[in-house]
Amino acid sequence: MSQLIDRRQNAGKKSTVNRQRFLRRYKSQIKKAVSEAVGKRSITEIDQGEQITIPAKDIYEPQFHRGHGGHIERVLPGNDNFIAGDRIKRPGGGGSGGAGGNASDSGEGEDNFVFELSREEFLELYFEDLELPDLVKKELARISTYKTVRAGVTTSGIPNNINVLRSMKQATGRRVALASPYKRRLKEAEEELERLKQLANPDKLDILKLERDIEFFKKKIQTVPFVDTIDLRYNHRVRVPSPSTQAVMFCVMDVSGSMDEAKKDIAKRFFILLYMFLTKNYEKIELVFIRHHTSAKEVNEEEFFYSRETGGTVVSSALELLNTIIEARYPPQAWNIYVAQASDGDNWNADSPYCQELLQEKIMPLLQYFAYIEIMPRHHQSLWEVYQQVKERYPNFAMENIDNVADIYPVFRELFKRKTV
């Protein structure tokens, strides 16, 4: 049996299949190295490839080889320094070994295996098993828009949908099926008539009968219509549900004076991961960036991550702007709306109850998911407490705490992990 090997997806490299097999085999070691690399990178370097090191012991494979026991005397080809019976000195440097490995007493060692992950491979491993949670509407498991698609042909329809080619094929087949018996009998009658006419004394009654039969068969053939109504075929189109993944993700970040550079760096890392994750997995997702201190404003991606503007803390300003943008541009009937907010938890005490009111009465009924991360290595403040009350009321509200850079990856996965059925 023949076997086809399709290498069109190998990007012009014959070793791609072997590389993919290697990545699958040592996936756990590679994913561990990837998660460690994320914590060491700056935001601008997060979407680059990575040099991965795998300890030699992890890629060791058992091998069959000759045993070292017994007594063997032999002289290998090409030897011009020794003869049988000579004693060879042990090589020096018995403590040599691989980089990062233990010393060897045999003069041999093995380095760790180092290779480069491409940007695509790095992101694929990093974002594996992640999915924007609950991409559903409130009423249905999936939002469905309908589109019209071809579904073959049918025997009924309107003239505009006539399939001429299929109709003519059907008519040809019908004419052949109906006329063939008469054509065969017509041919036999004509041959018999020709034979009788060549006789010296033919029977005139037989000739007359054959002539009548021939005329009858010709009329029967002519009465077969060229196209009949039963031949007509119409293009059949049906409406099928088309799942909608039209979503908008609001990224809300606190840039007030209480957010020091370390906290801002953690928040920026979280949002850049979120941004990369969304753009990698979903083509029809819009991102809206809102940064706030005492006032909030919608900004572009560059200003969201790198602007140095700062001030006090009024979280409700961001929530009010969020609600205004949703009402103006993203009707919940047409959009799946998600919000991710990063803050240190500091807020004007009198403002926190208003934030709770905004979320519970106006914003949460419009959303599919709200993810809140609080960058707070110490005790939580009033904002966390009111958000806890929102979480108890709305199951689509999630909140997690981040203490340092090392917590970003686990928290990110927890907030956006793929749910199993």
UniProtKB/Swiss-Prot annotation:
Region (Disordered) residue ranges read 83-110
Q: Which InterPro entries match?
A: UPF0229, vWFA_dom_sf
Q: Where is the composition biased (Gly residues)?
A: 91-101
> The organism sits in which domain of life?
Bacteria
Query: What family is reported?
Result: Belongs to the UPF0229 family.
Cross-referenced NCBIfam families: PRK05325.1-2, PRK05325.1-3
Q: What is this protein called?
A: UPF0229 protein lpl2726
Which organism is this entry from?
A: Legionella pneumophila (strain Lens)
